[in-house]
Amino acid sequence: MKLTCVLIVAVLILTACQLIAADDSRDLKRFSRRKMRDGMLNTKNMKRQCLPPLSLCTMDDDECCDDCXLFLCLVTS
C-alpha cells in the first residue's frame, strides 16, 4: 500500500514537471521575450546601435541581436 502511494505521488510530481516545462517552451522562437521587447522599443523616434552580424554576444546583450548562437550575433534584418 505504501509503495503504491509513493508511486502515485511520484507520477503526479513528474507529470506536473512535464506540464510546467511544456508551458515555458511553447512557441519560444516565435514569441521570445527579446523579440517582444524589441518590437515595443522599435519606434520611429528611437534609434539604437545594433551589433554587426557575427559579432560576439551573450544572451544578456541589449544591442538588438536577433539570435545569439554559439556566442555569435545572428541578425536577420
Curated annotation (Swiss-Prot):
The presence of a 'disulfide through disulfide knot' structurally defines this protein as a knottin. The cysteine framework is VI/VII (C-C-CC-C-C). One of its GO terms (cellular component) is extracellular region. This is Conotoxin ArMKLT2-0251. GO terms for molecular function: ion channel inhibitor activity; toxin activity. Expressed by the venom duct. Its main location: secreted. Residues 23-46 form a propeptide. InterPro entries: Conotoxin (IPR004214). The modification Pyrrolidone carboxylic acid is found at residue 49. Keywords: Cleavage on pair of basic residues, Disulfide bond, Knottin, Neurotoxin, Pyrrolidone carboxylic acid, Secreted, Signal, Toxin. Residues 1-22 form the signal peptide. Transmembrane segments: none annotated. Disulfide bonds join 50-65, 57-68, 64-73. It comes from the Eukaryota.
